[in-house]
Amino acid sequence: MKIGIALLVILLGAGCLRSEETEIRILRAGGDPSVVVMEQINLYSDERDGAEVKKDFDQLIRDWRGEEDTVEKRVGMLAKSRELFIRDGKVVFRQTYILQNLDISDDGIRVGDSQISWTLKDDGDEIVETNGKVLPADPRTIVWPKDAPELRFRTRQPLRQAFETSQPLMVQMVKDRLADDRK
């Protein structure tokens, strides 16, 4: 999935982690800087082989632990928290950042005189919920008033063939890791 602010590039660094849904909330009381909360729901590997799924799991753990913060800092983001947990039998990865400047036109976000627009870059994403307005002429673009205190949307991505094999493995590996961390 290719959503702006380079958020998903950070999470999907290995290129084989996928999620069924992504929710992004940008809290902007008073403008910049903003607080960005991204939640990826039902993470799974795009691989079917157990060893390859394990590699993707290891990448997820590195992302969770914040081992690759240099990319985030380069795009003006400061990581505040990362949470990895199981909810309703699904792996969820929630990241919270401070974003110095919301106007990132290269990543699909534009702050104009009267509105903020965000154009999703992946045609496969379906916008399933937003507090903005989806443009009828371009169903991949969402707009909000410039002074909106919160920008929020949720997208759904089609599940890939590897989902049925890798999702249960990923859930079990996360459960095991979280149990080990509690010891």
Question: What is the predicted role of each segment?
Answer:
Residues 22, 35-38, 80, 93-95:
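Hydrophobic residues positioned within well-ordered beta-strands of beta-sheet architectures
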Residues 23-43:
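Post-signal peptide N-terminal segment of mature Sec-exported envelope proteins
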Residues 15-19:
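Bacterial signal peptide processing site
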Residues 9-10, 63-70:
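N-terminal start-of-chain detector that recognizes signal peptides
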Residues 37-64, 130-141:
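Post-signal-peptide N-terminal segment of Sec-exported extracytoplasmic proteins
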Residues 1-14:
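Sec-dependent bacterial lipoprotein signal peptides
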Residues 33, 46-47, 104-106:
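Intrinsically disordered, low-complexity acidic/polar segments
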Residues 68-183:
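Mature, soluble, non-transmembrane domains
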